[in-house]
Amino acid sequence: MSEIGSYHDTIFALSSGRLPSGVAVIRISGPKTRFVYETICQAIPEPRHAALLTFRSRNGDAIDRGLTLFFPAPHSFTGEDCAEFHLHGGKAVVEKMLAVLGELPGCRIAEAGEFTRRAFANGKMDLTIAEGLADLIAAETEGQRRLAMQVASGNQRKLYSEWRQRLINARAFIEAELDFADESDVPGSVSMQVWQQLSALKHEIEHHIASGKRAAMLRDGLHVVIVGAPNAGKSSLLNFLAGRDVAIISKEAGTTRDLLEVKLDLGGIPVYVTDTAGLRETDSVVEKIGIERARARMAEADLVLSLEDMSGPVSVTVEKIEAETWLIGTKADLGGSASGLWKYHISTMTGSGLEQLLDALQAFAEAKIGQIEDAVPTRQRHINLLRATIEEIEKAIEGDDLPLELRAENMRLASQFLGRITGDVDVEEILDVIFSQFCIGK
C-alpha cells in the first residue's frame, strides 16, 4: 500500500453489498474526482446535494442513470475530494462502471481499507476510531454494535489523549525543576506532587485495563462447551440451542467425534456453544482424537455444561478444569433419582427445563460482561501498550535513587506508548495490519 502522504492516485471501489442488489454504491476519493465527474457525467454537481445524472463511458454510451453526491475536500470522509455514484445493482451495470473508471488516467481500484487509511492520514480520525469502524462493520450482535459505536465515536481517543497530556504536563514540571531550579518563579520541589499525580494515573490505567477483559469477551464472544458421556444428550441440547439440526442424533455411542460449534446471540452478547465427543475410554483412534480436542476446548471455555443421563446409574464425574461447570441432568422425562446433584434438569424430548437453562446462560453471559464503560481497550494492541505505559510510569515513580533526567525520560516513553495507541506517534509498522481488516470499499 502507498506510504502515508503520497496518495496521488484517485481510488474507487464498490462500497455496498453483494451483487445483484437494488442499489449499488461506488465510492471515489482523490485528486481526479472532479475529472471523473467531467468525463462520466459532463458536470460537477453541487456539493452535498444529490443529483440525478446519466453516467456515460468515454465514447458517450450511457451506462446507467442514478443519483450522485460530491463531497469536496477537506470536508469529506477521507479529507480528499470524494464522490458516490448510486447505480442499479445489476452485475453488468456495476462491472461496466468499474471498468470505465479503471480506464481513466490516475484512477485505480482501492485496496482493502484504503479509504479509511486515507482518512487517518489526513487527520480525519485516529487509529482507535478506525478500529471502532472495523468492529462496527463486523458487529453481529447488539452488544457488539454498542461497544463498536463507543469506540468509533472517539471515546477512547479522548481518554488516551487526556492521559497523555497529563504525562506531558508532569514531565514539564520535572524538566522545569531541572532547568530553572535557581529561578524564583519555579516553586520549591514539585517532584512529590508529580509522583502523586502519576500514581493516581497509574491506578486509572490499571482499572481501565481490567475492563478490557469484559470488552474482549463482548467483541470475541463467550465460549460454552458441552461435555459428557456418549448418549448423554449433548447433541440434542446443541440442536435445541441452535434452533436447527446441527449435530447428528443417534442411539449409537460415539456418533459425535469432532467439535461442532454454533453461535448464539444472548441478549446482544455473542456466545459460542461447542458440542464435543463423548468422554469415555475407547480403542478408536479417531474417537480418541475427538476426546483430546474436547478436553482442549474445555480448557479454553468460560463455562462447561457437564451432562449426564438422569435415567441411568448415577456416576457424576467432573473433569478438573478452571472454568465454571454446571452439572446438567438430561432425559428428565424418563425419571431418575438423586436430582439434587444437578443444577438443572432438562428433557429435549418434552422441552422441560430448556428455556430455564437458556435464560440461565444469558444471565451468565450478562454477568460476565457486566456494564461496559464508555471507553474500554478493545484490542490486545491497546492492552500491551497500556501495560508498557504503566511500566514506564512505575519506573518514574519508584526511581528515587535515579537522576530526575532519567525519570523524565521514563515519562516521555510512557506518553509515547499512549500516543501509539491513537496513532499520534510511530505506528507505521502496524497500519497495514489494522486497515487490511476492512473491506475493499471502506
From Swiss-Prot:
Keywords from the UniProt entry: Cytoplasm, GTP-binding, Hydrolase, Magnesium, Metal-binding, Nucleotide-binding, Potassium, tRNA processing
EC number of this enzyme: 3.6.-.-
Residues involved in (6S)-5-formyl-5,6,7,8-tetrahydrofolate binding: 27, 84, 124, 442
SUPFAM superfamilies according to UniProt: P-loop containing nucleoside triphosphate hydrolases, TrmE connector domain
Enzymatic class: hydrolase
Subunit: Homodimer. Heterotetramer of two MnmE and two MnmG subunits.
Full protein name: tRNA modification GTPase MnmE
UniProt source species: Brucella suis biovar 1 (strain 1330)
